[in-house]
């Protein structure tokens, strides 16, 4: 996609079901995106280095977030719907503004050692993971990547 300098939410067509790899990579003007309900996969590099992207609403049908999907963005938080089963390598690499991740799956999605990587360790120093109280122990493998795990979400 061509670079856009719009400083507002990017409205995707509700009929959209598939994003291509690198679909919005380097679109520096996008600040917020709401993915339509038909989108189940956020592909590799889909929003990588969209340096002003601070907010994303994932489809309630999202199952997979692939490698580097949100790397280098300005995301401050993200809510993973209950349907998410996996997050790839470096999904949130160098997302230095990320302070909160809400994860609604009752079974922790599969992640890699680099899903929440940051060159300076900022994510671990400042970011909290919020999960359902009944799912807290399912996220034991995630604890090393966050400042704290808070079990206080309510079912969506």
Pin down the residues of each PLM region.
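Structural signature of tandem-repeat unit edges
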Residues: 1-18, 28-41, 51-64, 73-86, ...
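Consensus positions within tandem repeat domains that build extended binding/scaffold surfaces
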Residues: 20-23, 43-46, 66-69, 88-93, ...
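Short, aromatic/basic amphipathic alpha-helical patches
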Residues: 114-120, 137-151
């Amino acid at each position: 996609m061509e670079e856009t300098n719009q400083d507002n939410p990017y409205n995707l067509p509700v009929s959209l079901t598939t994003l291509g790899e690198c679909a919005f990579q380097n679109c520096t003007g996008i600040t917020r995106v709401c993915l339509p309900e038909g989108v189940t996969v956020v592909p590799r590099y889909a929003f990588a280095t969209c340096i002003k992207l601070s907010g994303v609403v994932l489809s309630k049908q999202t199952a997979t977030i692939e490698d580097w999907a949100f790397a280098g963005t300005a995301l401050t938080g993200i809510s993973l719907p209950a349907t998410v089963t996996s997050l790839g390598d470096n999904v949130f690499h160098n997302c230095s503004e990320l302070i909160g991740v809400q994860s609604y799956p009752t079974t922790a999605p599969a992640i890699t050692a680099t899903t929440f990587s940051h060159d300076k360790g900022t994510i671990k120093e400042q970011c909290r993971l919020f999960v359902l109280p009944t799912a807290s122990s399912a996220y034991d493998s995630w604890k090393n990547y966050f400042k704290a795990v808070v079990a206080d979400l309510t079912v969506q």
